Design a protein with these regions (language model features):
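Core segments of cupin and vicinal oxygen chelate
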Residues: 2, 8-46
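Residue-level marker for the onset of beta-strands and adjacent loop->beta junctions
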Residues: 5, 34-35, 59, 96-98
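Vicinal oxygen chelate
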Residues: 76, 80-118
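N-terminal beta-strand motif that seeds the catalytic metal site of vicinal oxygen chelate
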Residues: 1-15, 58-63, 116-118
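Short amphipathic alpha-helices within nucleic acid-binding modules
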Residues: 69-76
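Conserved short beta-strand elements that form part of the metal-binding/catalytic scaffold
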Residues: 28-59, 65, 109-114
Length: 118
């Protein structure tokens, strides 16, 4: 096994959800039909399937970056492009992680994070 390659999520509006991830994080649309939308980024597939209501079970998606400075750069870029951050980028080497979060159109939290080496 090489790792996780695909995640499928419920969405009340798969096209709207896909547009958020395309615009915010650079995903590319692979396929779309009445039932949903498939996106891809770096070999990872993120799919949205139509549902009457999204599953709100505390799920959070996280995108790992290579440096703490990248966390700050992503936070600044998304904020400047009009995405509402749920709080400023926070955390340091002492805490072990630096991150920030935004909400997607279905209310899921999406984090950009960096883990400092131990």
């Amino acid at each position: 096994m090489r790792g996780v390659g695909q995640l499928a999520l419920h969405s009340t509006d798969p096209s709207r959800a896909a547009e958020f991830y395309e615009s915010a994080f650079g995903f590319r649309r692979r396929a779309a039909d009445d039932g949903g939308v498939d996106l891809e980024l770096g070999g990872f597939e993120l799919s949205f399937r139509r549902a009457e209501r999204p599953a709100r079970d505390g799920m959070q998606l996280g995108f790992r970056v290579d440096t703490a400075a990248e966390v700050d750069a992503w936070a600044q870029e998304l904020s400047q492009r009009g995405f509402a951050l749920l709080g400023p980028a926070s955390g340091d080497r002492w805490e072990g992680t630096r991150s920030f979060r935004v909400s997607d159109p279905d209310g899921r939290q999406v984090a950009i994070f960096y883990h400092y080496p131990a």
